[in-house]
Amino acid sequence: MRTGVRGIAVAAAMVVALTGCGDGEGTEAVTGNDAVPGIAEGKQKVPPVTLDEAGMIKALPLSSELTHGTYGAGDPVLVQGAETAKACLDTLEVECPGVKTASKKDLALVGSSSDTGATFALFTFGTEEEAAAVLRTLEKHKKEFDGPSGRYTPVKVESGGADEWFAIERKDFVGVYMRIGTVLSYVITDDFGREGAEGAAQLQVGRLKVVAGGGDPDA
């Protein structure tokens, strides 16, 4: 799992996101309190990145922001309350203790008979520790999963500012899974290629941080 904290200007984040460039260096998976900066060192933490219900929808990318083709978007879905844990389990295929709210949007290439498209999903948790624990469980699950289509291959991508992340690939599928504060982000792509998936992940991180900071990513 990759870990790191990067302050990025909004303009730079959007440029990087739309170009889909970068090749990160991998690190060992983070476990325990070391997964959340400041806890292991005993430092006072700044409030973590989080999103309210409106932000969970606003932070999801727009179809017009994907530049390699024309994409149509389904209506974004927001899940709250008792249904959230099931929605998280159904999407991530692992239990999600502490999950509070979920949102999701599908984007598909217009006029294509292929499966080219992307899915963006966000999950907020009560604490960074809860979000980090679910991300570690998810990474372990994906590395061990062996289905009819074969195993996933870990790949290196640059997230554009997530606290922790990992990415996997299988045939035309690339998935990027990230934690930004108390939010888990899930970006999966079909027929985008690794660089296209990386760009989609960076786009998601850029929008999320703008919304969490009280800004409008579409202004």
Please place each PLM-identified region on the residue numbering.
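Bacterial N-terminal signal peptides that target proteins for export
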Residues: 1-10
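C-terminal motif of bacterial Sec signal peptides marking the signal peptidase cleavage site
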Residues: 16-20
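N-terminal "mature-domain start" segment
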Residues: 22-105, 200, 205-219
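Short Gly/Thr-rich strand-loop-strand
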Residues: 40, 45-46, 50, 73-88, ...
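Extracytoplasmic/secreted envelope proteins and their assembly/folding machinery
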Residues: 57, 122, 131-135, 174, ...
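Short, hydrophobic/aromatic-rich segments at coil-to-beta transitions
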Residues: 98-108, 159-167
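A short acidic-to-branched-hydrophobic micro-motif
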Residues: 102-135
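Short, well-ordered beta-strand elements
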Residues: 119-121, 182-191
